[in-house]
Design a protein with these regions (language model features):
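Short, aromatic/His-centered strand-loop micro-motif at the edge of beta-sheets
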Residues: 88-112, 119
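Short, composition-biased motifs enriched in small/polar/acidic residues
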Residues: 196-267
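Short strand-edge motifs at loop-to-beta-strand transitions and within beta-strands
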Residues: 26, 111, 248-252
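Secretory/extracellular carbohydrate-interaction modules
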Residues: 10-86
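Extended recognition patches within non-cytosolic domains
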Residues: 184-199
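Short tryptophan-centered beta-strand motifs in secreted/extracellular beta-sheet-rich domains
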Residues: 41-43, 108-122, 129-133
Length: 267
């Protein structure tokens, strides 16, 4: 319970991580040391409460090496001066070698965050970072990433000699929201590996007399059964019939008439 689902993404499962303003640093070893190429990561993020003390700039997550304080693809957060917040990306210490996304996010909103750290060989300050916030679901699983929300920042800041772990962190009440939730952390070498698309379950029809049951498995939550009077041109909307659980399936009973009704599952 409490998982953060991202529409179009593979279903969330297992536990999520919740933290508050209490200072902490959770460093997760990757099991390898990367010194070349690219590293991608993704996770779902929801801020449940900002808190009255949250007035500064904080760091939520990113990649690093060992127990040091030099970071790469660092996900930053700040209040927008109203009732929401903004996310940014930077490399090294502070936020000088980075940028802020223009998006204003609200408390309770689930955000899909994708980051990348790219090793460049020319100098000790030329590695770059990129950030995607809520990328279009049509890009999930693609070979080539879509255009980034923040593209290729970090040049000029100190490079990481290697990347061997991912971290989540909290600083203090002034730099960390009062309550945050993250879920479905994925780390890989390609965009596709951290944006696996949801597999649409099969929709079955079982008829009996003048009624029929539409069935799909309960292990594929997050899908909405929609209907339309035409496949191509008419709008789609959620069915009005109640959805019930029938064993290992969700089930909707419909009356069979002479009117055309088309059905689909949408995540």
């Amino acid at each position: 319970p409490g998982n953060l689902d991202v529409p179009g993404l593979a279903f969330a499962a297992g536990n999520c991580l919740t933290w508050t303003t209490q200072p902490m640093s959770l460093r997760l070893p990757l099991g390898t040391n990367l010194t070349t190429g690219e590293l991608f990561f993704s996770f779902a993020l929801r801020v449940d409460a900002l808190g009255p003390s949250f007035t500064g700039v904080g760091t939520l997550a990113g990649v690093t090496t060992g127990t040091g304080t030099l970071f790469g693809s660092k996900i930053n957060i700040r209040t927008n001066g109203s009732v929401g917040f903004q996310l940014g990306l930077s490399k090294a210490t502070g936020t000088a070698y980075g940028a802020w996304a223009p998006d204003d996010f609200a408390v309770g909103e689930t955000i899909f965050v994708v980051g990348r750290y790219r090793f460049n060989p020319s100098s000790d300050t030329d590695d770059t970072c990129a950030l995607w916030l809520n990328p279009d679901r049509t890009s999930f699983g693609a070979i080539v990433p879509p255009s980034a929300t923040i593209a290729e920042v970090g040049a000029g800041g100190a490079d990481l000699p290697q990347v061997d772990r991912f971290f989540f962190r909290a600083g203090s009440g002034s730099t960390t929201p009062a309550k945050l939730v993250t879920d479905e952390l994925r780390i890989g070498l390609t965009w596709a590996s951290v944006t696996p698309p949801a597999v649409v379950p099969a929709l079955r029809l079982v008829s009996s007399g003048d009624t029929a049951a539409l069935l799909w498995p309960t292990n594929a939550p997050g899908f909405v059964l929609e209907e339309s009077s035409a496949v191509m041109s008419a709008p789609w909307f959620a069915v009005s019939e109640p959805i019930r659980t029938n064993g290992v399936n969700f089930s909707v009973d419909i009356s069979l008439t002479n009117n055309s009704r088309y059905f689909r599952l949408r995540h």
